[in-house]
Amino acid sequence: MNILITGGSSDIAQAIAKRRSESGDKIIITCSNDTSLNKTLAIYRQQNIEVTGFIYNFSDPQACENDLELILKEPLDGIIFNAFTRVTQLRKLHALPYHAVRAYLDNNLNGNIWLIHRLLPSLLKNKFGRLVLISSLSAAAGTSRYPVYCAAKAALEGLFLNLAVDYSANNILSNIVRVGLIKTSRTEQFWKNPAYQEKVMQIIPQGTMGEPTQVAEAIDPLLSKTSFMTGSVLTVSGGLPLMRSEGLLS
């Protein structure tokens, strides 16, 4: 299969790329700028993972048009929508400047939707496609001080459910993977804190945070050529939002 993974520099993207590459898939990644792309490709080479990549920036998605034209000369079988802007200001909604709220929504919604819109005609022509949104428990649980992130993820989940309804008869299947607390570079400020780790172990039903490799493993059936899953929401979270009550009461 030819697999496109957006946000290719993330730990989850790297785990997916490694797993799928070992299965014989051709992997294409995106990064938001030259520096990130070159650094990320070097990381993949160090791990002996064969990938190609191009720049895809939410603020100017059309700039990647020439790269997409080249990529689409071969059928694109699966797209993992993993790219998302990092949250830098943990505040309640009223404390965020509205221009920042609007910019975040514009980038993350329009950036992802533009790519879906651009790729659908090719998928329809090939009568095959596997679309996977890497979402978050925050889309349903409303994580504190992540108002715009929660809104954007929930909006994309709604779109993916619509895609499942409208395109599954064309063998274009759309599914959502909601991840919980995963050990990545974005969350290391939390999981490297012993006190946080102890509390997490008391609350998460499985008693531990997840690994990027576990997210990658969960995606396999969603990319299958014989899959009968569409419009599904797969939760990779160790049991969250279910919680162990002794952890809450301790």
For every predicted segment, state its role.
Residues 121, 165-166:
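Alpha-helical segment proximal to the catalytic Tyr-Lys
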